[in-house]
Each structure stands twice: as structure tokens, then as C-alpha cells.
Amino acid sequence: QANKLVNSCSLCGLCQEVCPSDFAMQDLCRQARQDMVARGKMPPSAHEFALLDQDFSLSADFALARPQAGQASSAEVFFPGCQLCASAPAQAQAVYRRLMATRPGGVGLLLGCCGAPSLWAGDDARLAGAHDQWRGAWESLGRPRVIAACSTCLKTFAEHLPEVEAVSLWQVLDPAGLGRPAPGLTLALHDPCTARHAPQVRQAVRELLAGLGVAVEELRLGGERTECCGFGGLMANANPELAREVVRRRGELSGRDYLAYCAMCRDSLAGVGKRSLHLLDLLFPGLAGEDPAGRPRPGWSRRRENRSRLRRELLRDLWGEEEAAVPGQAEIKLIMDESVAARLEERRILAEDLRAAIARAEAAGDHLVHPETGHRLASHRPHQATFWVEYSPGPEGFVVHNAYSHRMTVVGGGRL
């Protein structure tokens, strides 16, 4: 229970903001996590999924550093962050093209992760590695000024990479000619907790909305006293039930559609059924469909696929670099109903792990068969968790009936 308490904190700083004695509960919880990691006492189940997602964002599947196409160097570089690209890749691409067209001196592109997951997890070694990689990519571009779309990235840079000159996208984006919101539109504005002490960012967002003619309903808890969406501090990984309650309660502060300018805030709200838009949905209408406030939260597998596809498309369309297909199990088509898909999402089981299990089982005949249903059961252990998938071959692909994972190791039990 002590572990769960320490790992359930969103590290958002609201406790300190309202405390008459200025007690920083978030610092205490993060220091406790650092101590647990250093002593080998942090349970892998608490943060492993988020840390592996960070690894993915720093891998060749997503990471990229380029000056603006056709230029040897650029005065600025756009860093959209990992979650905007995972949630809304079309909007990320559109805003980058806008920056290239309107910013003097050229705007390069840097894809990757700021290291926030390892920071929140208390994994200092992993954080240092992420920052070394990010710093190396940034320095390879000539140390340009960073235009960041994510307030968490900005906060991370300010506190841990002070040599980086960074500014919010919302402070530099030219809105002229962008957006056609309906007349009289009023939205409830959700400030991300990482913008709590960034008044210049919050003000820039409100000025953009005023320029678009969008009226803002200020939530009872906003600005310096805004609440976390449940994703911060990896709360949703360590204590998903609490995270759902936090974001559900946040969504009940107003009956209006919400507007967020953090991708994870928007997706967290959408995940509990709260109609929510991202600011880029207003600035680049049509990219999220006819009802952007009703856009569902992309699942974990889709988030990775979106990042990889965005990287490939940008390399092809802007730099003329066509990447060869990465060998793997992408050709294995998975078929499942909505209830199974929801179960996999809740259990944080990725499609790529199911494909890997099925590919190995089909190639080696290394699977079990249920005597009554004929369903096959196969496993895959890429890291510390073993993934099991119950499936059956079909004419159009492999039908997934169920999947689960565990962290047990059966001594002498072979690969299964």
C-alpha cells in the first residue's frame, strides 16, 4: 500500500499551491520513487509500460533530427513531443508546415521524447540517457531555439536542460487565416498541470482563442490551481482506477465541451467520455473529422503506429527519403471484437506483442490447443512481462479471443 500511495501521486504540484505552509508533496513522492529505484525496490509493474513507450519514442521508429528541408541549418526547431504525434499526427504535421511557411530563419524538426516518463518514475539513469540522446540530437542541429507544443516538455527543459532555449508553440504560432470556428462557440478551457507556473503560455492560449472568436469558460479549478488529467506522474500506470476517477471528476466541472492544449489531457478526458477538443483542432479544422470533440482516444497500439507513420511520411514528403519497410510481424492481421480490444487496452497489451507471439507459435508449432474450442494459446516474453494470446487462424487473419500478461518466471518451464 505504501508503494501504491507513493506511485499514485500525479506530481502536479497542486498540493503545494494550496498548502499554507508551501509543503511540496510532489517532491517527497518523487524522491521516494528515486530511492526505491536506486535500491531496486520499485515494482516493475508500476512504470514499465510507460518507460518502454519512452524507449520507443527515442528509438529509430520515431526519433528524428533534421534542419528544414533544403537548408543546411535552421534558427529554430519544432519539437511536437511524443504524445501529440501519437494522438493527432495530422495536426502535428500541419502545424510544422505552418511554422516552416511563417517563421524566419527556417524551422527544423526534432522528434523524440523529453524524458518525462523516466523523470516521473524516479529512474534517474534512464532520464540521464534520454537527455543525453535528446541533447545530442539538438546539438547536431546547431542548438537552435526549440518551439515546443507540450507544456510538460517545456517544464522538463526548464528544470533539467537549462541550456536549451525553448518557447511554447502557442506563443509563436501565427493564427492568420487559420480556423473557422462556429460563431458564438464557447468552450470550457482546461489548463494542463505542467502550465501551472507558466502564465505566459496560458495567456498566449487565451489570446489565440480570442483571436478565433471563441469564448472561454474558465473552470473553477484552472490557471495556477488547475488539476491534473490523471496522466501526470504516471498515475494512470500505477493506479488506473484513481486516474479514471480524477479525470472523470475533472470532466464534471462543466457541461460544455472542453478545450485542451495538451494532447494527453485531451485524450484522458476523451477516454472517460468527456467531449474534448485540442486547440489544434480549431486552428486546423477538418483534420479530426466533422466532430473533433467526439474524437475517441487512440489506443496504445495506435499511438505507436501513429508516431512511426508520421516519421515515415515526413521523411518521404519533406526530405525525399523513402524508408524500407521494417521486417517484422506487420503482415499478421489481428481480428477481434470491441470487448476484446477494450480488454487489451485496459491491460496495456500491444498488438505488436500479440503478433510476435502468434508469429513464433505458427513458425515453430510452439503453442497449446484447447481440446474443445480448438483455440490456440501462445506466449511471448520481450521484457519482464510474458504475454499470452488465445487465438485461432481464420481466412482473413488471426482471430484474437483473449490475451493477458504476467510477470512470473517458471523455473525449468521452457519458453512457455
Task: Show which residues each predicted segment covers.
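Acyltransferase/transacylase module recognition
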Residues: 233-241
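Active-site glycine- and acidic-residue-rich loops that bind
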Residues: 84-91, 95, 194-208
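Iron-sulfur (Fe-S) cluster-binding modules
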Residues: 1, 12, 28-31, 37-41, ...
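Hydrophobic alpha-helical positions that pack around
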Residues: 189
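Nucleotide-sugar donor phosphate/pyrophosphate-binding loop at the beta->alpha transition
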Residues: 126-131, 240-246
